[in-house]
Structures are given as structure tokens and as C-alpha cells.
Amino acid sequence: MNIIEQIEKEEIARLTANKTIPAFAPGDTVIVNVNVVEGNRKRVQAYEGVVIAKRNRGLNSSFIVRKISSGEGVERTFQLYSPLIAGIEVKRRGDVRRAKLYYLRERSGKSARIKEKLVSKAAKAAQ
């Protein structure tokens, strides 16, 4: 392992020491709590949407969340280990067969729905 990988590993450990990042994948509906600074006030803003892409690159890992806001599609890219992210909560698991769901950009309404992933009996028994 080279020096850069070692430093990145230590930085990830430092950034995740006070928060837990759940396992999520494209197709999942997540709620991302983001710290927003307005003037001298700091508040937490919830951003809920479908994960359409996830990029696993160590410290540079990121994911894109898409939601429909007042009839208009809005996408936001988040850095996974950013200190601005207060927390991530998985609301619903989606059953998709693609790693990148960019095709949802052209779809709206019923055609943009994602089937919910059902938990198998073996997985329930393991819990």
C-alpha cells in the first residue's frame, strides 16, 4: 500500500468516526441530511430522492440523488465523506439491474417508478 492510499484510509477513518454511513445502492430512496449555513445560522436540510449513481473511489467517493421538486427534476451530487453531510438514511430499497440509472432523466410518472426490493427469508433469518 503506498503512502497516498494509507493517508486516504486514515482520513476516511477520521471522518467516519462520529457518523455511520449505511450501505446503499443505485435505485434506493435515501434521505440525506445536509448542514446548511445561512448567514450566521447553521441548520440541517433534508434532501430525499432516488440514488441514480454511486462512484466508489475511496476518499473521493460520491453519489447522485435525483428528486422531483414542483414538477421539475433536480439532481444533486454529494461527496460520501463530506463533513457537510450530517447523516444518510435509507428509506426504501430499490430493485434495479443497472449501476447507473441515467435513463430516469428522460422518464416521468409511472415509467420512472422503481420496483421495491423484497427481503428474502434467508436474509430475515440472518437478522
From Swiss-Prot:
Any idea what job this protein has? This protein is located at the 30S-50S ribosomal subunit interface and may play a role in the structure and function of the aminoacyl-tRNA binding site.
HAMAP family attached to this UniProt entry: Ribosomal_bL19
Give the gene that encodes this protein: rplS
Q: Which family does it belong to?
A: Belongs to the bacterial ribosomal protein bL19 family.
Source organism's superkingdom? Answer: Bacteria
InterPro entries (UniProt xref): Ribosomal_bL19, Ribosomal_bL19_CS, Ribosomal_bL19_sf, Translation_prot_SH3-like_sf
Q: Which SUPFAM superfamilies match?
A: Translation proteins SH3-like domain
TM segment ranges? none
**What's a Pfam family this protein contains?**
Ribosomal_L19
Q: Which GO terms describe its cellular component?
A: cytosolic large ribosomal subunit
Mind telling me what this protein is named? Large ribosomal subunit protein bL19
This protein's UniProt keywords: Ribonucleoprotein, Ribosomal protein
Query: Which molecular-function annotations from GO does this UniProt entry contain?
Result: structural constituent of ribosome
